[in-house]
């Protein structure tokens, strides 16, 4: 009887130690799935911001012609929203890129995302400066 209890205890200990040494693969799978979904969502949001930037560029051309104060304020609001969203994403992805458990492909994805976000912030900021430089006509 002592032998069976000792054997059972040894099996339980071996299972616990092997689980500790090998690690929990399910956690890695969940983390990889989360990373993949996060990158897909980021790609969608970047695409939306790029389309918004294109639309705002067209509105800027109209602003140059009409010099409308309301249009200027609307463009600046939308640029501020897009820029703040991208700055928040930049902080998050800078933090995530420092993780040590990333493989080569994941690290590349994070670095590519960081550079894409930085470029979008730069473009949004440039357009905001152009819009701010337009003096609205108060007579319309």
Swiss-Prot record:
One of its GO terms (cellular component) is vesicle. Keywords: Allergen, Cytoplasm, Endoplasmic reticulum, Secreted, Signal. It is found in: Cytoplasm; Endoplasmic reticulum; Vesicle; Secreted. Its main location: cytoplasm. Residues 20-53, 108-140 are annotated as: Immunodominant conformational IgE-binding epitope. Belongs to the mite group 5 allergen family. This is Mite allergen Der p 21.0101. It comes from Dermatophagoides pteronyssinus.
